[in-house]
UniProtKB/Swiss-Prot annotation:
A GO term from the CC aspect: excinuclease repair complex
Gene: uvrC
Keywords linked to the UniProt accession: Cytoplasm, DNA damage, DNA excision, DNA repair, Excision nuclease, SOS response
Residue intervals of the GIY-YIG domain: 16-94
Cell compartments where the protein resides: Cytoplasm
Family: Belongs to the UvrC family.
Protein name as it appears in the record: UvrABC system protein C
Organism: Vibrio vulnificus (strain CMCP6)
NCBIfam families, A to Z: uvrC (TIGR00194)
Length: 610
């Protein structure tokens, strides 16, 4: 019998100071983390005789213990609360699902700076521009930059070992700073200066400078140079025509739209830097049942801006579609401390800010509606599959597939679905070794052993295990898994998915461990769910296989050369920029690689020419 928490005795020990509290259930699992300006006052509110919130009632009924940490200020409490939420992922807290850092454009502090995509902590010396909504937006910008400002994008190791310009120089995508005779340090620094201004949003300043350069070149009858400057000017103006610019020029701000319905919330963030819209992203936090919209919005705001704060730029202005219920000053102070400058919230914007907020709210509502419709489709498919397999519930499914080319570079994949669809953070790949090439049974056996031999949490035990294969694959999989499910509280249903002779979608044969075969109509929602998880598993396996095969083939040409071991192979590929670059290198260039003598360079050169 669960022991009732003695709230009266506990509250007598609680201070009126600010701090953080952690609530535990009977299994000593943290189920809620909160902060308070006055701990005693806040914790007492949970144990009043009349509590309106159903969520609070459910939370209190599960409390077995409460730990309290006192802090000096409410700001400290806010940051500590965030750290605890991230550490424990409590059941009753609103949780930020997407905790990935945003990508930036990085301009290195090298003598000849390199421009590249960067994600993560800002530890390298250089300048960071962004954030951008996703890596695709960064790559698109880098591609554009190559055409207008041909600053190098190659790795420093490749740059350091070049004696002649690469293909990027030949097609006008790099100025060629790796070779001193191609461009001077002064001219390259000027080019980098234009790029820096462009990334800072100072397009007009760049245009003024380029127009001046074009006019001077024309006056000096340097018509080729003038034409080059003219092309740069035209390219920048085309970019300006395509890009929406804020009336609040040079301003950095995030605009947060919000929508919540049917247990799904969406916060859409529009990112504006230097007055330009860099892009946007929708977030769908994980919400405990019966959580009100205000708590969702407040919790998301603090978690979002305090997560990865070393890699995330907090803008000076944050536009919100509603007031915060929490202490606004404390949150602003905490974010200002992290950002290193004053951060302000605005909840009743006008002018262009108001239009941005309306746009962000519209996007939040649209994304939420799409999510709800997707969830309804997923729910229908899960119900159909439960009916087909006569199961009471399906909380978790896993699917396995094998990928290789003629037995080479074998990879196994495992993908996971729950009632909301794919759980991509739990996808896994297994590098298969020590088997006969092409032996799919052995590969599947090895993958399943590595997956299930270790102790599993109860919630990680699947209700269904799909095997992408026929009877032989399924039987082998069953032989492996029965060795481990003796201590499991439930036995997964195992289903094989055979593609059939024509391998056309909709004609799959489904096989049980008893050897029974059955088919589902091509329009059956249950079949669509099975096809979805099968395709996810196949794509995950083949992506891993292709990466492994590419890496293997990159080094295989060097493996038969006497005197070239793993370390030297790695050095050769690293310092020349890849196998194709190595094949084009001269003996003298190969000899410049650390650890490679001139005589060995000649052997390598001759071997690669055969």
């Amino acid at each position: 019998m669960t022991q009732i928490f003695d709230s009266v005795s506990f509250l007598k020990t609680v201070t009126h100071q600010p701090g953080v509290y952690r609530m535990y259930n009977a299994e000593a699992v943290v189920i809620y983390v909160g902060k308070a300006k006055d701990l005693k006052k806040r914790l007492s509110s949970y144990f009043r005789k009349k509590v309106d919130s159903e969520k609070t009632k459910a939370l209190v009924s599960n409390i077995a213990k409460i730990d309290v940490t006192v802090t000096h200020t409410e700001t400290e409490a806010l940051i500590l609360e965030h750290n605890y939420i991230k550490q424990y992922l409590p059941k009753y807290n609103v949780l930020l699902r997407d905790d990935k850092s945003y990508p930036y454009i990085f301009l290195s502090a090298h003598r000849h700076p390199r421009v590249s995509l960067h994600r993560g902590a800002k530890k390298r010396k250089g300048e960071y521009f962004g954030p951008y909504p996703d890596s695709g937006a960064v790559r698109e910008t880098l591609h554009l930059i190559q055409k207008i400002f041909p600053v190098r994008q190659c790795e420093d190791t490749v740059y350091a070992n070049r004696t002649r310009p690469c293909l990027m120089y030949q097609i006008g995508r790099c100025a060629g700073p790796c070779v001193s005779s191609v461009i001077s340090d002064v001219d390259y620094a000027e080019l980098v200066g234009y790029l820096r201004l462009f990334l800072q949003g100072k397009d007009n300043q760049v245009l003024e400078l380029l127009v001046q350069k074009m006019e001077i070149a024309s006056q000096q009858l340097k018509f080729e140079d003038a034409a080059k400057f003219r092309d740069q000017i035209q390219a920048i103006r085309r970019v300006q025509e395509q890009q929406y610019v804020s009336e609040d020029s040079q301003e950095d701000m995030d605009v947060l739209g919000f929508a919540q319905e049917n247990g799904i919330a969406c916060i859409h963030i529009l990112m504006i830097r230097q007055g330009k819209v860099l892009g946007s992203r929708s977030h769908f936090p994980k919400i405990p049942q019966n959580t009100n919209a205000q708590e969702v919005f407040d919790s998301f705001l603090t978690q979002y801006y305090l997560s990865h704060n070393e890699a995330r730029t907090i803008p000076s202005r944050i536009i919100l579609n509603q007031e915060l219920a929490a202490d606004v000053e404390a949150i602003q102070l905490a974010l200002s401390d992290v950002a290193g400058r004053k951060v302000q919230f605005h909840t009743s914007p006008s002018g262009s800010r108001g239009r941005y907020l309306k746009l962000s709210n519209t996007n939040a509502l649209t994304a939420m509606t799409t999510k709800i419709n997707h969830k309804m489709t997923i729910n229908q498919r899960f119900k159909a599959l439960r009916d087909v397999l006569a199961m009471d519930s399906i909380a978790r499914m896993e699917c396995f597939d094998i990928s290789h080319t003629m037995g080479e570079s074998t990879i196994a994949s495992c993908v996971v679905f729950n009632s909301e669809g794919p759980v991509k953070q739990e996808y896994r790949r297994y590098n298969i070794t020590g088997i006969t090439g092409g032996d799919d049974y052995a590969a599947m056996g090895q993958a399943l052993e590595r997956r299930y031999a270790k102790q599993l949490d109860v919630e990680k035990i699947p209700d269904i295990i799909f095997i992408d294969g026929g009877k032989g694959q399924l039987n082998r999989a069953h032989e492996i898994i029965v060795q481990y499910w003796g201590d499991w509280p439930k036995r997964p249903v195992m289903i094989g998915i055979a593609k059939g002779v024509t391998r056309k979608p909709g004609l799959e044969t489904l096989i049980t461990v008893d050897g029974d075969e059955f088919h589902l109509p091509s329009d059956d929602p249950a079949l669509h769910l099975i096809q979805h998880i099968r395709d996810e598993s196949h794509n995950h396996a083949i992506a891993g296989h292709r990466a492994k095969r590419g890496k293997t083939r990159k080094t295989s040409a060097l493996e038969g050369i006497e005197g070239v071991g793993p370390k030297r192979r790695q050095a050769l590929l690293k310092y020349t920029g890849g196998l194709q670059e190595l094949k084009r290198a001269s003996v003298e260039e190969i000899a410049k690689v650390p650890g490679i003598s001139h005589s060995l360079a000649e052997i390598i050169y001759q071997a690669l020419k055969q």
